[in-house]
């Protein structure tokens, strides 16, 4: 189905599932993901300016998540790119990868960054 889109060799990383209670209780998932991504890019000497779009995947709402994608992009160093948030319960990461691939395949994007993060072990608790 996709002939132009691919994930380059060494162009990916994954972190272990985190327990958000205890030492990580006050961490913000988007900030943690963006800081980790920035280190990932720096270790490979890759410039975040190469990306033209950022797809943020996140299911559990947190403060600032409404504008989470451009915020995360700015934190990794891609300050002028747009983005979107995808929240698709139990399928968020797969949907992000698919949307990134389709965007490249159709020419909508040249080089899209898919960043998925969450606080799943804490469970959703939203107070209005």
Task: Please describe what each predicted stretch is.
Residues 1-81, 117-128:
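Conserved "HGTGT" condensation-loop signature of ketosynthase/thiolase-family condensing enzymes
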Residues 58-111:
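Conserved catalytic cysteine-centered active-site region
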């Amino acid at each position: 189905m996709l002939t132009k889109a691919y994930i380059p060799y060494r162009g990916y990383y994954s972190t272990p599932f985190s327990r958000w209670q205890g030492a990580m209780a006050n961490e913000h998932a988007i900030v943690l993901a963006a800081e980790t991504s920035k280190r990932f890019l720096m270790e490979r000497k890759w410039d975040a300016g190469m990306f033209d779009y950022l797809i943020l995947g996140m299911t559990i709402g947190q403060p600032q998540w409404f504008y989470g994608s451009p915020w995360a992009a700015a934190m990794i160093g891609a300050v002028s790119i747009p983005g979107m948030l995808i929240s698709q319960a139990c399928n968020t990461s797969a949907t992000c990868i698919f949307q990134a691939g389709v965007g490249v395949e159709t020419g909508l994007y040249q080089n899209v960054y898919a960043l998925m993060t969450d606080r799943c072990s804490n469970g959703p608790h939203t107070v209005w």
